[in-house]
Amino acid sequence: AGYLLPVQYGTGVIAEHMAVRTKCGLFDVSHMGEIILKGPDALKNLNHLLTNDYTVMACGQARYSPMCNEEGGVVDDLIVYKVRDDCYFIVVNAANKDKDYAWMKAHVSGEAQLSDISASVAQLALQGPKAMDILRKVAREEDIPEKYYTCKFHCTIDGMDCIISKTGYTGEDGFELYCAPADAPALWDALTAAGALPCGLGARDTLRLEAAMPLYGHELSPSINPYEAGLGIFVKLEKPD
């Protein structure tokens, strides 16, 4: 997709994989895409664009969903965070962010606006059974979400503004932190100094595969529908109009 990212660090894929399974690893996944959907008709459009149902959702809650084309094939899979009743923060796969944004723009209707904010957001993924302990060394307790698939939007770490979500792509406990790109190196340094091991995309792939988490371009594609991919639980056929 045109990104220069480490497959592994000096420790190697196996050591990085095991660090996430037993302690804590840190991934730079700033290549992921971020989109804002807002307006009075934001919810209506979410339920139109995505297969999951976003009707009943609290602010600060996150929800996963496939996004499908007219034939039922998967355009992408993504996570939606509810900022407020008329605003949603959407995280999409890096290789698909331009395609996803164009797809959404082509299918949004009514009073709703889309904004691609990918260039102004960096993402670090802190993953593993010790992730909570490490995050507590650098973040305020009130800024740390406790429940899986929830987030805190207005957090600070060493004076840096960030979003902290209790989500991940490894099958382990963990967090994903969103910040300004200029703050990402300092945030990375703070988390590694607190004990997180730098991990590359090689370990990220083995971890997600071991946890049976699909990856677009492999287990997901426009020729594969959510049922074929084992994601039928995220398809809600009856949603409010």
Predicted features along the sequence, with ranges:
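Short, acidic/polar N-cap/turn motifs at the starts of alpha helices
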Residues: M32-E34, Y64, D77, V121, ...
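Acidic, proline/glycine-enriched N-terminal capping motif
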Residues: A1-C68, G73-V75, G202
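Conserved, structured C-terminal
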Residues: A1-T11, V83-D241
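Well-ordered mid-protein domain cores that form the structural environment of catalytic cofactors
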Residues: D53-H107
